[in-house]
């Protein structure tokens, strides 16, 4: 479910305590980088429950887009993150098959790195992120 540009347009999410922090972050993010669907933030829903969130960190720049995702705590370790990541990849490739898809993680093995590996991302190595410091950068390698 797309997260829209303003709080007023996101009333359904604004009343959900699970969305408080991420909704504000997305709206603030749009103010910095712009609102350019489909390269926006999303909530993932299953059976009427919010199960996670997903985002593109802005529209592609130099034909490269970075993805980000998270799983609600009550839905972790059930494949939700893997499915969310897959949907971001599919949306990217459907929108622009030539786009290079990347992701960044903390520089250690984790559930997030495993999710990327399951979705055909390969570790490129260390990069310095302006917000997060030293991180691992990953790139999607196989077309769906």
Regions found by a protein language model. Give the residues of each.
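Short, positively charged
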Residues: 17-25
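Acyl-donor (CoA/ACP) binding surface of acyl/acetyltransferases
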Residues: 1-14, 28-29, 36-144
């Amino acid at each position: 479910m797309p997260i829209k540009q303003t709080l007023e347009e996101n009333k359904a999410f604004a009343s959900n305590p699970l969305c408080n922090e991420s909704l504000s972050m997305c709206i603030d993010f749009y103010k910095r980088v712009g609102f350019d669907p489909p390269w926006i933030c999303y909530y993932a829903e299953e059976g009427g429950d919010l199960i996670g969130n997903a985002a593109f960190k802005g529209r592609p720049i130099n034909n490269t887009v970075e993805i980000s995702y998270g799983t609600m705590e009550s839905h972790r370790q059930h494949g939700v993150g893997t499915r969310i990541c897959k949907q971001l990849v599919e949306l990217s490739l459907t929108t622009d098959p030539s786009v290079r898809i990347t992701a960044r993680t903390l520089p250690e093995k984790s559930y997030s790195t495993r999710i990327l590996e399951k979705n055909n991302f390969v570790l490129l190595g260390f990069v310095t992120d302006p917000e997060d410091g030293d991180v691992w950068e990953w790139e999607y390698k196989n077309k769906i």
